[in-house]
Amino acid sequence: MTEQEIKDLVTRQRSYFQSGATLPVSARLAALRRLYNAISSHEKEIRRALQKDLGKSGFESYMCETGMVLEEISYMLKHTPKFAREQRVHTPLAQFCSRSYKKPSPYGVTLIMSPWNYPFMLTLSPLADALAAGNTAVVKPSAYSPYTSEVLLRILAECFEPQYVAVVTGGRAENTCLLREHFDYIFFTGSQAVGKEVMRSAAEHLTPVTLELGGKSPCIVDQTADIRLAARRIVFGKYLNCGQTCVAPDYVYCHRSVKDQLIKEVQKQIRRQYGKQPLHSSDYGKIINEKHFDRILGLIDEKKVVHGGGSDRSTLRIEPTVMDNVTFSDAVMQEEIFGPVMPILVFDSLDEVIRRINSMPHPLALYIFTSDKKAARKATARCGFGGGCINDTIIHLATSEMGFGGFGESGMGAYHGKTGFDTFTHYKSIVDKKTWIDLPMRYQPYRKGDEKLVRFFLK
């Protein structure tokens, strides 16, 4: 799409939004139903596209992508009528004879920029929230997942006219053109580097943004943890989608006394979940492209590998890999791994862990495996992070009743469920004043006794 075509598209969407067509709750629900039905009817195509782009199995495609989108749409279909109501609030005595309320109002024309690692879910979940809130949307999927982008284009073109929801495909040139336009809200999921560019561009128009970024999410395992269960759940969260998950445990921070036991259990769980030859497993995905394949291999120190380490360039697969005796100065600890490599570091005290984590950029997630409730409370209270789990990994993002988002360097804003509706909503504060009485004390010239009345009301 050319720069002029993008300009025209944004203009058409703004005109459509200003017509009021997206405001009725009935229109929002109809849009969500169309989207739900289209996804259901195209499920086989979605599965094939995700298999081609990322090697995802059918089960994983539904569990982590299609099913999560359908669940989010279902949640919005159920709750949007309630969310969209005016919210009555208390009126202070100084505003005598008034009715005060907050009016949920859509921002207008929104831009949703999604990544390649969960290209279906991370496009359509925020879109469902935006539509429920009454916005129009321009959707820009990643160029790195072309098969899924093509399916998204077909599904959304089938459901919506472009003045309501439109898909812009392409790469950096299209991204640049889009970010020059004046949107009313921008929702971006991706890397920190690109997130900064999005925020700089948004600042030109003072456009509010949600940035869902990433970071090095720690997974703490203390000496009281159920090591066998911890290993099972860590392996699941770490190697899901070949480690290409923004909330995957980036590294394991293990108490020195249980490290060897944890490594043995992790090795067992990798064999149990992915088999003796994971490079040939139909359930194990692949790295998105050769550039990322080479980047991940460059982080592996062969001398520190205690499991895995093998790869197949022809299929872009890297074995689930575990590294021991890792320090914070190793290459694997200098950037977000975003791949199937698990470094294991050791600690001697929880205070040491908290100091170290807080000395680093705020991660998107934090996980702690422990039987000590005080330790869990201390870690989750004292460390800065977006969200997380106690005695599990990654599942916190699958709960519509909780918002999901980053903190500090891992992003800003959140979505899912009511939080997602609120993200795409501006709450107008309105006072509806009665006309049959008008207290004179606020008007000049001020008279003796007016200040006493003001002091009575305002204290």
Regions from the language model: what does each represent?
Residues 1-101:
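N-terminal Rossmann-like NAD(P)+-binding subdomain of aldehyde/semialdehyde dehydrogenases
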Residues 3-6, 25, 43, 227, ...:
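Residues at or immediately preceding the N-termini of alpha-helices
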Residues 15-21, 112, 219-221, 251-256, ...:
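Short, well-ordered beta-strand elements within core beta-sheets of diverse protein domains
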Residues 17, 21, 36-39, 43, ...:
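Structural signal for hydrophobic packing residues in well-ordered secondary-structure cores
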Residues 28, 73, 134, 165, ...:
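Residue-level signal for inorganic ion chemistry
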Residues 93-229:
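Rossmann-like NAD(P) dinucleotide-binding subdomain of oxidoreductase/dehydrogenase enzymes
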Residues 160, 193-327, 390, 458:
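ALDH superfamily catalytic-core signature
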Residues 220, 271, 317-459:
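Conserved C-terminal structural/oligomerization subdomain of aldehyde/semialdehyde dehydrogenase
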